[in-house]
Amino acid sequence: SPGRLEAPSPFLSMFDAHVVGQVIRSDEGFSLERLVLPLKAKDGRIGAWCVAMPFLRPSDVPRIEDATEPYAEGIEALYRQAIEHAKAKREAGQALIALGHCHLTGGKASEDSERRIVIGGAEALSAEMFDDSVTYVALGHLHLSQEIGGDSTRRYSGSPLPLSFSEIDYPHQVVIVDFDGEVLSRISEHKVPQSVELLRVPSSPATLDVVLAALSDLDLPERHEAEWPYLQVRVHLTEPEPSLRVQIEAALQGKPVRLARIETSYVRG
């Protein structure tokens, strides 16, 4: 919840870390000041301004009269207000960065990880709401690392860890962005080591006899139990198989692996 996200703010502020979990509004309008934060260099100088926009619920956004998509258009309007507020603070040589927890048009979602964000009749927002004054847009929600529209300055860094078996082949990383004044000088990707492996056996669903043979042939190195891989087993069935788990566990007997999920799909026999 927004309140839970902001609960540790007093502690985190001691380390110059800031959490913005919700939008505050009053009769006078939105509190744009809390959405626009200075980013300081080691010497204390402000090097950039950040539009720290949290996930926006329908009740968080401005009401747009005669809007075709009230929620999406409200989000875009609030971003425009916050960006203009940041531009008013920005001085020469300072970059402008925007954050967003949203699904932009053209972004690729995982098979079974992200919650679907439905914005009125549309599911995605246009990247055009970030105009050329915004030097870099750091996006969250989609777990696959990706650029939007082929623009390296509008991107999802992706999840640093796999959050489902569908993300096994994703590049899990942290993206570091360097600026020279207001100019983006370098974007570097740093892979996150994976301490526990995820396995899919087989890589594509197969019949039960093929799956059991593959599990029996599974050759894994011995390691501490806390480092055993998590395993997803993928089986094609023609009818329900009551002893499916028993057969799979028997094939895995004595192997250093943790059975996390059995995925079944049905085909006509």
Name each region found by the language model.
Residues V20, V51, I97, Y136-A138, ...:
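Hydrophobic/aromatic beta-strand patches that form the interior of the parallel beta-sheet core
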Residues S1, F55, H101-C102, G140-L142, ...:
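Active-site metal-binding loops of divalent metal-dependent hydrolases
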Residues F179-G269:
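Accessory, non-catalytic peripheral segments of nucleic-acid enzymes
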Residues R45-G47, A92-A95, V134, L184, ...:
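A general structural motif
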Residues H18, W49, T153, R186, ...:
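Conserved beta-strand segments of alpha/beta enzyme cores
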Residues M14-G121, S157:
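Conserved catalytic scaffold of divalent metal-dependent phosphoesterases
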Residues E91, E128-S133, E225, Q253:
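Short, conserved loop/helix-junction motifs that constitute active-site signature segments
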Residues F11-G21, L104-V183:
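Conserved beta-sheet core of the metallophosphoesterase superfamily
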